[in-house]
Structures are given as structure tokens and as C-alpha cells.
């Protein structure tokens, strides 16, 4: 992010505990705002979200599927407003369209905490790279695949390789120290399960 010109803007979330999971209004004394702000959850942006114009980001929630605002959609930030973020879609069927991202309330789907956190934040994360699973369903002009070890499930190589629209748009880096063979990645199929 430091390589992008322009001013960095920090957005802070508003974190609260869902009233339905509290005990007689004791929530404020049990869980401080600082504690709630410190909690990280997968699929939910952190309390402090640092952004810049030109930064690639990924949408973390379905907002408007017909407009291309789906979980996993990648965008480039155009403007950082007080109440919205303007972005341009760079993947999917709505490439080039400008969209406005509002703050929304998100809660983790799985948590071992004795309460449900409600975090009001922009549903995006900085995205210079993505997992194979997150790329599923997208068509991309260029795909760089980094494989530090063997893929962990059948079909992952197929999903990764089939994202790219042209053969010359694919680059693969295999860096598996444990593998005895050079430049080989196994796509193992267990015929016993069929």
C-alpha cells in the first residue's frame, strides 16, 4: 500500500454486542469497546481499515448481485468518502462499472464467544491476492499461482487453472521443499472413492 501515491484514510468500525445475547444490560461492563475492537474474525474487516485511492479491494458480502456486487468481487478504489466508498469493478460481468459501497452491519457466522458481535464497517478487504476457493466462478486475464506445497484437495488445480481466459495469462510458481520431483504438482485422484 505504501507504493501507491496519495493520502491514506483510516476507517474505524462501530462494534457492539447484539442485545439478544446480553445478560440484563451488563454488556458494557463485561465487554469494553476496546476489547470488541480488538477481535478479528474471518470474512469480516478489522476494526481499523486503512485504504487509499487506487488500492485493489475485495467485497466480503453480497450487496446487490444484479449490479455485480457479490462476495469476492474485486474493485479498485476511486474515492474515499465519509459515508461511502466509490470503486470501479475489475472482475466479473460488470467490469468497468462504478459502484458505491456503504457501511453495513456484519456478524461472524462462527464464534466461540458467549455473545454475538455486530460490526458496522465497509465490507471490503485489501486484495492483492486471493485464495483458489475465493477465485472460483471468476474469469481473469492474468493468474499468478503460488504453490508453496501440494494442493490439499482434488480439483483445486483445475479451479485455479480454469480461472484464466488465455493460456499466456497463466504463471505458476512451485516451491515445495518436501517434494523430491522438480517442478511437479500432483493433482491426486483416489479412484477408490468412485
Q: Which residue ranges define each predicted feature?
A:
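RecA-like helicase/translocase P-loop NTPase motor core
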Residues: 1-194
Amino acid at each position: 500500500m505504501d507504493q501507491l501515491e496519495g493520502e491514506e484514510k483510516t476507517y474505524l468500525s462501530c462494534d457492539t454486542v447484539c442485545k439478544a445475547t446480553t445478560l440484563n444490560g451488563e454488556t458494557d461492563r463485561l465487554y469494553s469497546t476496546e476489547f470488541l475492537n480488538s477481535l478479528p474474525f474471518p470474512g469480516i474487516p478489522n476494526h481499523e481499515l486503512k485504504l487509499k485511492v487506487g488500492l485493489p479491494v475485495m467485497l466480503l458480502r453480497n450487496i446487490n448481485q444484479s449490479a455485480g456486487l457479490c462476495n469476492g468481487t474485486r474493485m479498485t478504489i476511486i474515492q474515499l468518502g465519509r459515508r461511502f466508498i466509490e470503486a470501479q469493478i475489475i472482475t466479473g460481468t460488470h467490469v468497468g462499472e462504478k459502484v458505491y459501497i456503504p457501511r453495513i452491519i456484519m456478524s461472524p457466522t462462527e464464534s466461540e464467544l458467549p455473545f454475538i458481535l455486530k460490526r458496522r464497517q465497509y465490507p471490503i478487504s485489501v486484495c492483492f491476492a486471493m485464495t483458489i476457493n475465493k477465485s472460483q466462478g471468476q474469469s481473469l486475464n492474468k493468474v499468478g499461482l503460488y504453490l508453496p506445497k501440494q494442493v490439499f484437495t482434488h480439483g483445486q488445480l483445475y479451479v485455479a487453472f480454469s480461472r484464466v481466459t488465455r493460456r499466456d495469462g497463466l504463471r505458476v510458481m512451485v516451491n515445495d521443499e518436501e517434494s523430491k520431483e522438480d517442478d511437479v504438482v500432483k493433482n491426486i485422484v483416489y479412484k477408490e472413492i468412485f
